[in-house]
Each structure stands twice: as structure tokens, then as C-alpha cells.
Amino acid sequence: MIKLKVKKGDEVIVITGKYKGKKGKILKVFPEQNKIVVSGINLVKKHTKPTKVSEGGIITKELPIDISNVAHVDPKTGNPTKVAFKFLEDGSKVRIAKKSGEIIGKEGK
């Protein structure tokens, strides 16, 4: 299994497929399947029957997409970028945008 460079809450942009060019935040990560759920991307409508607990109707929800179809958004420019890892002076490991060098998020020690 490969090391994932994405985390829940990261801002990503879709680079291929039907939703190409759209941005969203990661809601859920499935590392064993290399898939993620992004807000507002890959929406489907599901018809549900009424039960004692909930009403029936049409529910719109996001389905997972492959990690290879998205790229991180550069915090400085807003464009797609690749991610690299870097160690800071205090020993913490952070993810940085390769294009601008901006820190994307902290990994912890």
C-alpha cells in the first residue's frame, strides 16, 4: 500500500473526469481502497423507502472517487500542486506545496 498524502479536511481540486476543475474539502479517506469522498463531488441521488425511523424520499450524497483523480490546492495560488514532506527545525514533519513551498498541514512528530 502506498503512503497517502491526503487527509480529512484538505482542500483538493479534481484534475480528471466529469467534475474536472471543481474544488472541495475531503470528508472521508479510504486508504485500503485508495479512494476519498470530496464535498460536492460525485453526487448521486438515492431513493429510500419510508421506515419507522425516517421518511422516504430522494437523498443526494457523495460517493468516493480515486485519489489519483485529485490534486492538492496550493494555499498561496489556488492552483493544483504536488506535495512533498519536509522536517522543520523542531523535528516536526510537515507537508509542503512543491510549487510555492507553503505548508499544507502538520503530520506530527
Swiss-Prot record:
The keyword Signal does not apply. PROSITE patterns: RIBOSOMAL_L24 (PS01108). The gene is rplX. It holds the Pfam family ribosomal_L24. Keywords: Ribonucleoprotein, Ribosomal protein, RNA-binding, rRNA-binding. GO terms for molecular function: rRNA binding; structural constituent of ribosome. This is Large ribosomal subunit protein uL24. CDD domains: KOW_RPL26. Part of the 50S ribosomal subunit. GO terms for cellular component: ribonucleoprotein complex; ribosome. One of two assembly initiator proteins, it binds directly to the 5'-end of the 23S rRNA, where it nucleates assembly of the 50S subunit. It comes from Rickettsia bellii (strain RML369-C). Belongs to the universal ribosomal protein uL24 family. The keyword Glycoprotein does not apply. One of its GO terms (biological process) is translation. InterPro entries: KOW, Rib_uL2_dom2, Ribosomal_uL24, Ribosomal_uL24_CS, Ribosomal_uL24_KOW, Translation_prot_SH3-like_sf. Signal peptide: none annotated. It comes from the Bacteria. The lineage of its organism: Bacteria, Pseudomonadati, Pseudomonadota, Alphaproteobacteria, Rickettsiales.
